[in-house]
């Protein structure tokens, strides 16, 4: 059993001290990424398998780099193209993973709960890299890490999350993570993309983007998931940009020096204007870098030692 | 529970040992040019800082001090009862071409030093690496020998050497603890 348990499924039930341990462990990992030789022998002889039922170059590469920097061997199962039904495919995947003797499995799956199901089936540590609209804990952890690095703390900060909350697993994990660490989370977006029950998660739902942005220390802009917009949940992209897009004028409402983040990939000119995305307050590129450090911390803490099997 | 069997060094003993090691480092390297000290977490760090202080008293020159965390280089993570928490390595200078003196409190099996050597090599290519320890308690499992030793203490493998330093433990002494079978 690793220092933070067997698996990482989500932040919903993760205690604050465990989140803090992950963030603290990512600090020395970031130092390794800055070195000329970005490699330590910690996970030599361990195998990390990435299984992606949805395409995601960014997250998959980030996990693979993290594993490689720690000297683990990596195997990729590209399941993105397969459209087999959930139960069967996951069982098959579990069999394959068991046969490979994997120490950790990184799973991205379109169905909520897939990671948890796999975690119950295999001995390996399972890391949820996004399951449906449920959770994306490693992204939220890198958001927390980036904010803590920029602001020196998390407690008492005002965090505005803007956009498509309904389809966003990042938003859900962010809400759990930031509120657990003592930050105030405000949400804003088209009414059709704000599902009920958000207040129960500890967040405040605002009636306008402006209200959410007022004095915010952190602005997290979510991607409009064009691939999930077949149902016509908002009138048009141009109108979305006008009503909800984060541009320079809107950003002035936030606290001076507010950090702007985006989980990527960005739709420039729709949810975020290019001058904000590339502006001085943007931490978007650092998020990518920090993502590798946080994932190194996760792999170390979940598979680094102990007698897991 | 471990029982205290004997005290090996008191406050003055630790001070004298470090002063002697500081002199030896300067003498062997013919001064302090090109010299850097790197303490191994945790108790190697205050010892390295103290050695740097002594060297400055003697030679009037400040020697850079770095901090090395070797957790990620251990070869025994799977056999440890508790997976250790990783802390930062802070070596804010280049080690390439330098004489690096690694500093630790106790040398025992030599595995920590081996890990530290790997860690240093990943940071650059030193001209020379030397090792300074406060206590050498024997029982080496690897062909590693310290260049500077505060005190050689023959121990049995059932015993444990505990170095207590003001900066970390709030007291200054070295004791042998005997663990019950």
Swiss-Prot record, chain A:
Highest rank taxon of the organism: Bacteria
Biological process according to GO: 'de novo' pyrimidine nucleobase biosynthetic process; 'de novo' UMP biosynthetic process; amino acid metabolic process
Binding-site list for L-aspartate: 86, 169, 223
InterPro entries: Asp/Orn_carbamoyltranf_P-bd, Asp/Orn_carbamoylTrfase, Asp/Orn_carbamoylTrfase_sf, Asp_carbamoyltransf, Asp_carbamoyltransf_Asp/Orn-bd
Keywords: Pyrimidine biosynthesis, Transferase
Keyword Transferase assigned: yes
UniProt entry tagged with the keyword Transferase: yes
Cellular compartments per GO CC: cytosol
Pathway per the UniProt entry: Pyrimidine metabolism; UMP biosynthesis via de novo pathway; (S)-dihydroorotate from bicarbonate: step 2/3
UniProt: carbamoyl phosphate binding residues: 58-59, 108, 136, 139, 264-265
Reactions the enzyme catalyzes: carbamoyl phosphate + L-aspartate = N-carbamoyl-L-aspartate + phosphate + H(+)
Cysteine disulfide links: none
E.C. number(s) listed in UniProt: 2.1.3.2
GO MF annotations, alphabetized: amino acid binding; aspartate carbamoyltransferase activity
Function text: Catalyzes the condensation of carbamoyl phosphate and aspartate to form carbamoyl aspartate and inorganic phosphate, the committed step in the de novo pyrimidine nucleotide biosynthesis pathway.
Assembly and binders: Heterododecamer (2C3:3R2) of six catalytic PyrB chains organized as two trimers (C3), and six regulatory PyrI chains organized as three dimers (R2).
Entry similarity comment: Belongs to the aspartate/ornithine carbamoyltransferase superfamily. ATCase family.
PANTHER family per UniProt: ASPARTATE CARBAMOYLTRANSFERASE, ORNITHINE CARBAMOYLTRANSFERASE, MITOCHONDRIAL
Cited NCBIfam families: asp_carb_tr (TIGR00670), PRK00856.1 (NF002032)
Protein's name according to its UniProt entry: Aspartate carbamoyltransferase catalytic subunit
Organism field: Pelotomaculum thermopropionicum (strain DSM 13744 / JCM 10971 / SI)
Swiss-Prot record, chain B:
Keyword Mitochondrion recorded: no
Broad class of enzyme this protein falls into: transferase
One MF annotation (Gene Ontology) recorded for this entry: RNA binding
Keywords per UniProt: Glycosyltransferase, RNA-binding, Transcription, Transcription regulation, Transcription termination, Transferase
Reaction(s) catalysed (UniProt annotation): UMP + diphosphate = 5-phospho-alpha-D-ribose 1-diphosphate + uracil
CDD domains documented for this protein: PRTases_typeI (cd06223)
Residue span of motif PRPP-binding: 100-112
HAMAP family: PyrR
Family: Belongs to the purine/pyrimidine phosphoribosyltransferase family. PyrR subfamily.
Protein name: Bifunctional protein PyrR
The enzyme's E.C. designation: 2.4.2.9
Subunit structure: Homodimer and homohexamer; in equilibrium.
Species lineage: Bacteria, Bacillati, Bacillota, Clostridia, Eubacteriales
UniProt KW Transit peptide keyword: no
UniProt xrefs under NCBIfam families: PRK05205.1-1, PRK05205.1-3, PRK05205.1-4, PRK05205.1-5
Function (record text): Regulates transcriptional attenuation of the pyrimidine nucleotide (pyr) operon by binding in a uridine-dependent manner to specific sites on pyr mRNA. This disrupts an antiterminator hairpin in the RNA and favors formation of a downstream transcription terminator, leading to a reduced expression of downstream genes. Also displays a weak uracil phosphoribosyltransferase activity which is not physiologically significant.
A Pfam family hit: Pribosyltran
GO biological process: DNA-templated transcription termination
Domain of life: Bacteria
